[in-house]
Amino acid sequence: MSETAKRVALVGDASFYVGPSLARELARREHNLVLGDPAEGLVDELTALGVEVEAVLGVRNLADPESAQKLVAAARTRFGRIDSAAAFSGRVVTGKFLDSTLEDLHSVVQGCLEAPYHFLKAVVPVMVEQGDGQVLVMTSATAARPSRGASLYSSARAGATMMVKNVAAEVARNGVQVNAVGTNFMDFPEFLRASGANDPEIRARIEAAVPLGRLGTVEEFASFCMPFIDGTSKFTTGQFIAYAGGWA
């Protein structure tokens, strides 16, 4: 185990979506890091900032129960503790409820509900044992309101959000905070592809539906997440916050 006074943060997937940006923000705040499948060049970039990084490969699929367990084991072996942990997972299934299939349901539940379940089951017991810790689960703003054309996805995300609230209530007395933040209308490839927003006309219509009139960036989203995982604010738990430009 490394002898260090730095906090230790675990990012479940550092190759995708907000993962690399979260890792950068945490490194700037002098956190040592445990990263699942970090993006190419990211480890060198972060170690240049003076932090230690433990990369864990082959764990991107958090719906696999072993993925989160491997991340936690790596953190405990290298650093002896986990002060904060963040994870994003999901499988987007679109279409009307009446047109959906059981296969669609199983897919979205596995990606959006089982994955955060496995992550929480792996991370939270360590923090309970420590008597301290912060967990942030990324769900979706569609968990907060009905979403036309994404009923199964919205429903599964709502389930994950309520799971976070229940876990938070269960472990609050152990000094552990568990919160959820849900995005929508984000300027990153998966959303652009799923929504058709690579087409400028479609993007303009989508942006018009956002009260702030634009798409969000992963960099600003990572900054928003920091108080939930950087140890500076520990009086919030069991909350869901939509990060969607005022849409939810």
Q: Which role fits each region the language model picked out?
A:
Residues 96-109, 202, 206:
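Substrate-binding pocket helix/loop in short-chain dehydrogenase/reductase
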Residues 125, 169-170, 234:
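Alpha-helical segment proximal to the catalytic Tyr-Lys
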Residues 173, 185-209:
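A glycine/serine/threonine-rich, flexible loop-to-helix segment
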Residues 172, 177, 236-238:
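Short, small/polar-rich loop/turn modules that mediate ligand/substrate recognition or access, typified
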Residues 2-34:
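Canonical Rossmann dinucleotide-binding motif of NAD(H)/NADP(H)-dependent dehydrogenases/reductases
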Residues 226, 233, 237-248:
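Short C-terminal tail/terminal secondary-structure segment
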Residues 136-159, 164-165, 169-172, 185:
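Catalytic loop of short-chain dehydrogenase/reductase
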